[in-house]
């Protein structure tokens, strides 16, 4: 056979930018197909036509019978199979090398721009890389495919899987699984049915079964790689969608905190003046400062009726009543304030209105 080194060098480049299953597939292609085909299988089919014998001396009958028995030689059929199966990988390798070259050029441009900016002293905002150039990333020393390179790789696997299936089915339709030792030929110019004999049929059957098994293994690896990439992509999509849902469902500020702060049980009773009027109805139901933001925005100052509880605070704490007997009308006590003449304690000397006179 010809020299396989040229094809091997190209496939080594593909090996650098492949997944783990893809590297196993390339190993199977190198060792169990190309190596076996170039060393052992070629010697078994080297004397195929020369040792093909028929029971006739009719000129041309033997050649016609050989063409009927072997439309294409097994060894040449397998060479075509390897070429067609490897061609998608070569296309992927060309795309990968083009992407690497584009990334190198982009890095050189960025380095030149950084040098020019450093010389002029002007600050230059960093330019984000194009999405088409970031086609893989290294995680723990492993290359993880992404972007356009991943799409090309998936298309490569689909094409080579189709090729594998087509060649396996074609080999079965042409030859079956095993070669028969005796082949009966009924083609013209043979005057009658002629018996023809295949050389070393058992040895050839061993290689036929081996090559079909390797083709089946390659097909299984291609399907496994498709499943691996598809399942990985689905998990990434599901993970991103789940993260987006979690971000939208993040808990906001606790709105129920205000409702949980309940006033003491006697708080509403303290807000009644002497006439029995309430300054506000209920603490939990009337939050004036929270429920009237429009008044604050327009600059309007609410009165005591609008702001519940504020009159109570100003009456008892802000205003300081005068106790002088000669207080004028301008120094009246605030409405709702009533003095209590009861003694504050037993030791106090001040009189209370309800003390009994003796």
Curated annotation (Swiss-Prot):
Query: Which residues point to the Extracellular side?
Result: 41-76, 186-205
Keywords noted in UniProt: Cell junction, Cell membrane, Gap junction, Membrane, Phosphoprotein, Transmembrane, Transmembrane helix
Signal sequence span is none
- Gene Ontology cellular component terms for the protein in this record: cell projection; connexin complex; gap junction; intercalated disc
Q: Where in the cell is it found?
A: Cell membrane; Cell junction, Gap junction
Instruction: Recall the GO molecular function terms of this protein's record.
Output: connexin binding; disordered domain specific binding; gap junction channel activity involved in atrial cardiac muscle cell-AV node cell electrical coupling; gap junction channel activity involved in AV node cell-bundle of His cell electrical coupling; gap junction channel activity involved in bundle of His cell-Purkinje myocyte electrical coupling; gap junction hemi-channel activity
Q: Does Cell membrane count among this protein's keywords? A: yes
Pfam families under this entry? Connexin, Connexin40_C
The segments annotated as topological domain Cytoplasmic are: 1-19, 98-164, 227-358
Q: Where are the transmembrane segments?
A: 20-40, 77-97, 165-185, 206-226
- How does the entry describe its membrane topology? Multi-pass membrane protein
Which InterPro entries does its entry note?
A: Connexin, Connexin40, Connexin_C, Connexin_CCC, Connexin_CS, Connexin_N, Connexin_N_sf, Cx40_C
Q: Where is this region: Disordered?
A: 242-262, 318-358
Carrying Phosphoserine, the residues are 353, 357
User: Which coarse location class describes where this protein primarily resides?
Assistant: membrane
List this protein's GO terms for biological process.
angiogenesis; artery morphogenesis; atrial cardiac muscle cell to AV node cell communication by electrical coupling; atrial septum morphogenesis; atrial ventricular junction remodeling; AV node cell to bundle of His cell communication; AV node cell to bundle of His cell communication by electrical coupling; blood vessel development
Tissue expression summary = Abundantly expressed in the lung, also expressed in the kidney and heart.
- What does the UniProt record say this protein does? One gap junction consists of a cluster of closely packed pairs of transmembrane channels, the connexons, through which materials of low MW diffuse from one cell to a neighboring cell.
- Family per similarity comment: Belongs to the connexin family. Alpha-type (group II) subfamily.
PANTHER family given in the database record? CONNEXIN (PTHR11984), GAP JUNCTION ALPHA-5 PROTEIN (PTHR11984:SF13)
Subunit details: A connexon is composed of a hexamer of connexins.
The molecule here is called: Gap junction alpha-5 protein
Species whose genome carries this gene: Mus musculus (Mouse)
């Amino acid at each position: 056979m010809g020299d396989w080194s040229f094809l091997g060098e190209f496939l080594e480049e593909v090996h650098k930018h492949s997944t783990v299953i893809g590297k196993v597939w390339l190993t199977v292609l190198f060792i169990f197909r190309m190596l076996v085909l170039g060393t052992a299988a070629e010697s078994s089919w080297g004397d195929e036509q020369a040792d093909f014998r028929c029971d006739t001396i009719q000129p041309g009958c033997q050649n016609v019978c050989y063409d009927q028995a072997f439309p294409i030689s097994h060894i040449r059929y397998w060479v075509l199979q390897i070429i067609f199966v490897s061609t998608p990988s070569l296309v992927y390798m060309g795309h990968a090398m083009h992407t690497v070259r584009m990334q190198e050029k982009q890095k050189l441009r960025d380095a030149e721009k950084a040098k020019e900016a450093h010389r002029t002293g002007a600050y230059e905002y960093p330019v984000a890389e194009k999405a088409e150039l970031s086609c893989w990333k290294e995680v723990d020393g492993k290359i993880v495919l992404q972007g356009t390179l991943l799409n090309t790789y998936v298309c490569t696997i689909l094409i080579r899987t189709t090729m594998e299936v087509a060649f396996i089915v074609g080999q079965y339709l042409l030859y079956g699984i095993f070669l028969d030792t005796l082949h009966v030929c009924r083609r013209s110019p043979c005057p009658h049915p002629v018996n023809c004999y295949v050389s070393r049929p058992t040895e050839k059957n061993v290689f036929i079964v081996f090559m079909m098994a390797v083709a089946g293994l390659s097909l299984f690896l291609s399907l496994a790689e498709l499943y691996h990439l598809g399942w990985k992509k689905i998990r990434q999509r599901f993970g991103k969608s789940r993260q987006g849902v979690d971000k939208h469902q993040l808990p906001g500020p606790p709105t129920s905190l205000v409702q949980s702060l309940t006033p003491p049980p006697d708080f509403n009773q303290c807000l009644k003046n002497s006439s029995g009027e309430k300054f506000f109805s209920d603490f939990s139901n009337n939050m004036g400062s929270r429920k009237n933001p429009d008044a604050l925005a327009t600059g309007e100052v609410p009165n005591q009726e609008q702001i519940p509880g504020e009159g109570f605070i100003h009456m008892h704490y802000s205003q300081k009543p005068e106790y002088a007997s000669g207080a004028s009308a301008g120094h009246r006590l605030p409405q709702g304030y009533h003095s209590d003449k009861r003694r504050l304690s037993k030791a106090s000397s001040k009189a209370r209105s309800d003390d009994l006179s003796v």
